[in-house]
UniProtKB/Swiss-Prot annotation:
EC class: hydrolase
Residues that, per the record, bind substrate: T57, D131, E156, K186, D190
Compartments reported by the entry: Cytoplasm; Melanosome; Nucleus; Endoplasmic reticulum
Pfam families, per the entry: AdoHcyase, AdoHcyase_NAD
Gene3D superfamilies: Adenosylhomocysteinase-like, NAD(P)-binding Rossmann-like Domain
InterPro entries (alphabetical): Adenosylhomocyst_ase-like_sf, Adenosylhomocysteinase-like, Ado_hCys_hydrolase_NAD-bd, NAD(P)-bd_dom_sf, S-Ado-L-homoCys_hydrolase_CS
Assembly and binders: Homotetramer. Interaction with AHCYL1.
Naturally occurring in which organism (per UniProt): Macaca fascicularis (Crab-eating macaque)
Record GO cellular component, one term: cytosol
DNA damage among keywords: no
Positions carrying Phosphoserine: S183
GO biological process, one term: S-adenosylmethionine cycle
Statement: the UniProt record of this protein carries the keyword NAD: yes
Name the record gives this protein: Adenosylhomocysteinase
């Protein structure tokens, strides 16, 4: 790999703009700044060669530079062909960190970019930071000879965590992994509050549509679906939920949402959002019953929720309105507006989640990398969680920015509750 390019980005000339954006983001990411303050001197990640596969955004750039400040060598690719922010990638490349990512990669280029991150000047990767599982899967299937040298995987998102548990159940997983997604300060913040803001940003930038008065259909009522439903309702839409899980369906109903099937909802909706992480959510028979100019988008990790293939094969006309916005005309004369080719709408059509909420998620990522690198004996092959105490530390690091003042337990109160005055304050089974 000695002839490897030092980086490949869309335009290195965007680096100065990217650096300005990073400077602003750092002020909105107190958790990562706390990590730098605590650990930049001791360098707990010294010797770690981290291959990262996660959306190459401004916020991710702050994460990357935090990992480097803590002693790691880092090489990076994006986990989605549309999610790279080219100015952020340029800033990281200009800083001398190998990054292989640009907005609008082909599927072949996407794989090439990931493969560039596997070998460092001193040897192959020994840590994985993944989002969605593509890097994890690639190494397990195509580069299994590298597995023995890898200490751990930290996985960012719901889809990637599902993949890890599936691999574990099938006896395929060969490396210890930490499920970052299900840290409370990730899933209950990034998935919920992040989507609550970035979904609307993506839809508005793509279409300028008026949401008030429309009928919006949200497929799935997990944390992501909850955030999306709140956002659409907040803008004045009447929101319909589809669900497979009776508990989530009951939650949605108790919040005042109508809950029905996609076969029924497809006839009513003006805006459709898939959030499930599953396949075949919106199919050809649904498109055929939709209203004219229905807007269809996805905020789950992969492009498998919406049957884009059916649209491409059955529409009589496809018109590209602008990048990541396509209008299909069906045989019945009605049009469908598809955003980001069925991939992540908030990153394909907008800038993704705000920096502050990503600081929660990425502080968990840094902690997971430190845990796996410095305490390998604690983590056998399997899927693990960060300790509750670290979850609480992530939250605490973000309180000052919001002027939050915590109440401190008295010694008497702590004894009454049977806990330390310093936490952890909830048992592991507590759901928040």
């Amino acid at each position: 790999m000695s002839d490897k390019l030092p980086y490949k980005v869309a335009d290195i000339g965007l680096a100065a703009w990217g650096r300005k954006a990073l400077d602003i983001a750092e002020n909105e990411m107190p958790g990562l700044m706390r990590m730098r303050e605590q650990y930049s001197a001791s360098k707990p990640l010294k010797g770690a060669r981290i291959a990262g596969c996660l959306h190459m955004t401004v916020e991710t750039a702050v994460l990357i530079e935090t990992l480097v400040a803590l002693g790691a060598e880092v090489q990076w690719s994006s986990c989605n062909i549309f999610s790279t922010q080219d100015h952020a990638a340029a800033a990281i490349a200009k800083a001398g960190i190998p990054v292989y990512a640009w907005k609008g990669e082909t599927d072949e280029e996407y794989l090439w970019c990931i493969e560039q991150t596997l070998y460092f000047k001193d040897g192959p990767l020994n840590m994985i930071l993944d989002d969605g599982g593509d890097l994890t899967n690639l190494i397990h299937t195509k580069y299994p000879q590298l597995l023995s040298g890898i200490r751990g995987i930290s996985e960012e998102t719901t889809t990637g965590v599902h993949n890890l548990y599936k691999m574990m159940a099938n006896g395929i997983l060969k490396v210890p992994a930490i499920n970052v997604n299900d840290s409370v300060t990730k899933s209950k913040f990034d998935n919920l509050y992040g989507c609550r803001e970035s979904l609307i940003d993506g839809i508005k930038r793509a279409t300028d549509v008026m949401i008030a008065g429309k009928v919006a259909v949200v497929a799935g009522y997990g944390d992501v679906g909850k955030g999306c439903a709140q956002a659409l309702r907040g803008f004045g839409a009447r929101v319909i939920i589809t669900e497979i899980d009776p508990i989530n369906a009951l939650q949605a109903a108790m919040e005042g949402y109508e809950v029905t099937t996609m076969d029924e909802a497809c006839q009513e909706g003006n805006i459709f959002v898939t959030t499930t992480g599953c396949v075949d959510i919106i199919l050809g028979r649904h498109f055929e019953q939709m209203k004219d100019d229905a807007i269809v988008c996805n905020i789950g990790h992969f492009d498998v929720e919406i049957d884009v293939k059916w649209l491409n094969e059955n529409a009589v006309e496809k018109v590209n309105i602008k990048p990541q916005v396509d209008r299909y005309r069906l045989k019945n004369g009605r049009r469908i507006i598809l955003l980001a080719e069925g991939r992540l709408v908030n990153l394909g059509c907008a800038m993704g989640h705000p920096s502050f909420v990503m600081s929660n998620s990425f502080t968990n990522q840094v902690m997971a990398q430190i845990e796996l690198w410095t305490h390998p004996d604690k983590y056998p092959v399997g899927v693990h969680f960060l300790p509750k105490k670290l979850d609480e530390a992530v939250a605490e690091a973000h309180l000052g920015k919001l002027n939050v003042k915590l109440t401190k337990l008295t010694e008497k109160q702590a004894q009454y509750l049977g806990m330390s005055r310093d936490g952890p304050f909830k048992p592991d089974h507590y759901r928040y």
